[in-house]
Structures are given as C-alpha cells and as structure tokens.
Amino acid sequence: TQIQRIASTGYYDEKAVSCVLRALAVTDPKSVEDIYNPEYLTVGFKQIIDSLGKTDLAKGADTIVVTKMALKLITLAHSVERNQRIYQRLSDEIDALSKAVTTEHSDFLNDELCVSSINTQNNFHLFGSLYQSIISPNFAKLLIYGDERFLRDTDNQERIRALLLAGIRAVILWRQ
C-alpha cells in the first residue's frame, strides 16, 4: 500500500512506514509485537481485507495493483530464501545495518515509535541501497506502476526499495 502510495502521490503514511522500516532493525525479537506494533499496521490490515476479502467486482484498480505487488513480493522472498548464499548475505548485511542505524539513532528500536529517527532519508538510502546491491542484480525486477514524476524522484526510489526490502523480510518472518 505504501509503495503504491509513494509511486502514485509521492506521499506515505509516516507511522506505517516507520513501523515496517523499524522492523528491519529488530533482529532478536521475543514476539511478533517486538517487530511490528499492531497499532501502526491498520492501513496494511485494511489492505489485506480489501485484497483478499472482497469479490473481484468489488475491488478497485488500486487494490488489484497492490494485491499483484504483494504476490510478486511473496514470490521474490521465496526465491531469496531458496538461494542460501544470497539469503545469508542479506541476513548479515541487515544485521550490520541494524547495528549502524541503532548506533546513530539510539531510540530507533524503542517501543514507542519515534518516526523522526526512523523515517530519515539516510535510513531510506541505507536500506534501499541494500535492496539495490543484493536483490536487484540477482532476481527479476519488480515493476512499480505510478506517476512518472514521483517514480523518477531519487528519494522516492530509495523509499520504495527500502519498503521492498522490508516486505521481503516480513514474508520471511511470516513463514518462520
């Protein structure tokens, strides 16, 4: 949902994005709530209901695009998991990035979501670069549809890549 929102409007839900971006840095959780605060996932929960709970006739074009993207992301995450070399490298890089980000922003992992520490362009750049260096060259590209003005913007590209990485991690965690 947030990827499509950025691609179409250039905007995003700051709390929802910070929740999933923060989740990339939680590498030793004791529960699901340590990773994702359900309070900030309302938009995502609504999207699941819209994507899977309605008949095809009741779904809007945006819902169909988001559903297709989610299915492609699930397939991509599965491909990453099957490639042990890439999977291990990604895991190691996420661990290293988690340490770097939490050193720079001591409140990054706090239970109370600190949006200003998480949603920095530098963090989007770090996580987006990780996606670009490990996932992009080794797997099929995911096509993101939206407004060309927003898709050309480098900051938006980094946000989208960071969110794709967060989506891959979410799928892998869900399977575990």
Give the ranges of each region predicted by the language model:
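Alpha-helical oligomerization segments
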Residues: 159-176
